[in-house]
């Protein structure tokens, strides 16, 4: 597993340390009910799909998709194999959902999964039939041509059944490319100690580069297939814009294993001969910088040195030989403040200025173990103090050890610490290696949401009692994870909802919403100014803002299958109904 090399930086200006609580509002929420002509195409878990990963991936699947490009427009698939759309313009004049596309689906197959739809761009969509077939659809501009049926441009069976996690489209050199991320939970005979299943994410690239002649129709075909595997269903997975990489957040780490059906193997690189003794370089550090001394072959001149340093990568080579050092740095550095010098033709001294002072590095280049770390006396003393609790002069430092605080037989799997801490990883699309790793630790994943359709979906994590919304920005080297909004105390509130199934928020951050498995919806609004004078008698101050909580009870006994939010409305999908809640005016 790759070691964490960066962290999530909270914007303190977006955090309210004085937030008290939500006030229950009795204001009614206008709710409109649309009865469906046919039931939603729900596929329940089979007896063979008994693991927690199956429940997370397919049992908690959100059957309702919202259109990020056209507000208040949602899509779902019904039991007749129809992709249906509802676009709201006037709440009091809601029509029936319209059919946009029809496909053949066999949900009775023992391996069948739920059909899944992903809106790829303003004019394209990706559809899985639940039996392993991927279809790419040209939708035209959905907001302007909502009456037009969708046109299939690509349809191909891709093996075992899957659901679509994310998709996007981009154009380069007149070639239209669609990137699709597929999720599978498959039997794994090699996993004898675990559940017997493994989780895979397949990143597929489809384009129309074939048929470049003027009179020849450009046909879409699969150009590349990359598979990454892990041991847990990811909380979050998305392809970056332009297909430059993949972002995955999961309890257990993922790694790429296959490319176009062939096992991914590291090419053997012949190291340059620099002498008989190891290591190749020595290094030491302070809180401000890292200094390393790289051994050079005899006869090396300054003109032979090829040195390249960016914010997060270092490359050192001599002439045309294989690089002595090449890879991702443990943490970002300041290239302008970093230097290198050559000492008496035998070594190269490199000084790297840390971008963030304080954290100590455990290695220079991620995965490179050919260097030796040299500690000074002060660092050795600090290390001994940190490890002093592991040694003791007392024969029995814990006299209460014969009185265990609990019965070990009463412990369950959920009481144990996980083998791997949850991580957020960004994989480079060219090297397929993680170049940005964040340890999420105790920051519980809550939900993901499309804020800007041109960007990667944002994700929400619990930080202490609050819920913080993060927007990935891969193009920003110094701040790839940007804190864009905060929902006060939502982390604490959602933990008390034992029957919670879905969570989401409005794209303009005006409210967050939770939905239980059955009937109830909770809305938590951002603090807003009050019309009257309120006075806090305990603290002796006037209250200028109040955050309201509202509860809606849906008139149905069917379980909730889908839940999406826009700036003005909440959409709740059940087996036979679609509810529209008017949240904001």
From Swiss-Prot:
It comes from Danio rerio. The keyword Transit peptide does not apply. Its main location: cytoplasm. The keyword Ribonucleoprotein does not apply. GO terms for cellular component: cytoplasm; nucleus. Residues 392-420 are annotated as: Disordered. It is found in: Cytoplasm; Nucleus. Residues 276-365 form the CS domain. This is NudC domain-containing protein 1. Keywords: Cytoplasm, Nucleus. PROSITE patterns: CS (PS51203).
């Amino acid at each position: 597993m790759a070691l964490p090399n960066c962290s999530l930086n909270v914007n303190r200006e977006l955090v309210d340390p004085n937030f008290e609580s939500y006030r229950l509002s009795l204001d009614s929420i206008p709710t409109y009910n649309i009865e469906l002509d046919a039931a939603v195409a729900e596929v329940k878990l089979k007896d063979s799909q008994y693991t927690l990963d199956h429940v997370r991936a397919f049992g908690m699947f959100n059957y309702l998709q919202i259109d990020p490009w056209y507000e208040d427009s949602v899509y779902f698939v019904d039991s007749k194999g129809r992709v249906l759309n509802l676009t709201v313009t006037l709440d009091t004049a809601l029509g029936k959902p319209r059919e946009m596309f029809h496909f053949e689906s066999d949900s009775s197959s023992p391996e069948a999964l739920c059909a899944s739809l992903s809106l790829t761009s303003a004019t394209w969509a990706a559809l899985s039939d639940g039996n392993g077939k991927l279809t790419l659809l040209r939708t035209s501009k959905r907001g302007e041509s909502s009456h037009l049926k969708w046109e299939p441009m690509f349809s191909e069976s891709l093996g075992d059944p899957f659901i679509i996690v994310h998709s996007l489209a981009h154009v380069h050199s007149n070639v239209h490319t669609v990137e699709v991320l597929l999720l599978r939970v498959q039997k794994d005979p090699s996993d004898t100690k675990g559940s017997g299943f493994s989780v895979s994410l397949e990143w597929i690239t489809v384009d129309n580069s074939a048929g470049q002649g003027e009179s020849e129709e450009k046909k879409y075909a699969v150009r590349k297939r990359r598979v990454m595997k892990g041991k847990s269903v990811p909380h979050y997975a998305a392809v970056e814009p332009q297909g430059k990489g993949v972002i995955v957040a999961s309890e257990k780490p993922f790694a790429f294993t296959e490319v176009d059906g062939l096992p991914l193997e590291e090419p053997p690189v012949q190291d340059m001969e620099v002498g008989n003794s190891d290591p190749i370089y020595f290094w030491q550090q302070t809180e401000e910088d890292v200094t390393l001394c790289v051994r050079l072959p005899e006869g090396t001149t300054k003109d032979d040195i090829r040195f390249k340093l960016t914010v997060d990568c270092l490359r050192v080579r001599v002439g045309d030989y294989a690089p002595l050092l090449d890879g991702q740095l443990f943490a970002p550095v300041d290239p302008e403040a970093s230097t290198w010098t050559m000492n008496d033709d035998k070594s190269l001294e490199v000084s790297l200025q840390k971008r963030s002072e304080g954290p100590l590095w455990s290695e220079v280049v991620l995965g490179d173990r050919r260097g030796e770390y040299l500690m000074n006396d002060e660092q050795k003393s600090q290390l001994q103090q940190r490890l002093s609790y592991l040694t003791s002069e007392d024969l029995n430092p814990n006299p209460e050890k014969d009185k265990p605080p609990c019965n070990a037989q009463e412990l369950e799997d959920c009481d144990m610490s996980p083998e791997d801490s949850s991580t957020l990883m960004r994989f480079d699309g060219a090297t397929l290696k993680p170049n940005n790793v964040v340890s999420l630790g105790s920051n519980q994943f809550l939900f993901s949401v499309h804020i800007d359709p041109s960007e990667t979906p944002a994700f929400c994590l619990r930080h202490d009692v609050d819920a913080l919304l993060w927007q990935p920005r891969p193009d920003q080297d110094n701040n790839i994870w940007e804190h864009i909004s905060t929902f006060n105390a939502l982390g604490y509130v959602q933990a008390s909802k034992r029957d919670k199934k879905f969570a989401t928020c409005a794209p303009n951050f005006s409210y967050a919403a939770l939905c239980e498995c059955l009937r109830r919806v909770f809305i938590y609004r951002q603090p807003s100014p009050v019309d009257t004078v309120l006075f806090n008698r305990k603290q002796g101050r006037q209250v200028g803002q109040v955050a309201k909580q509202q509860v809606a009870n849906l008139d149905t006994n069917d379980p909730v299958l889908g839940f999406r939010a826009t700036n003005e409305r909440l959409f709740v999908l059940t087996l036979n109904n679609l509810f529209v809640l008017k949240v904001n005016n």
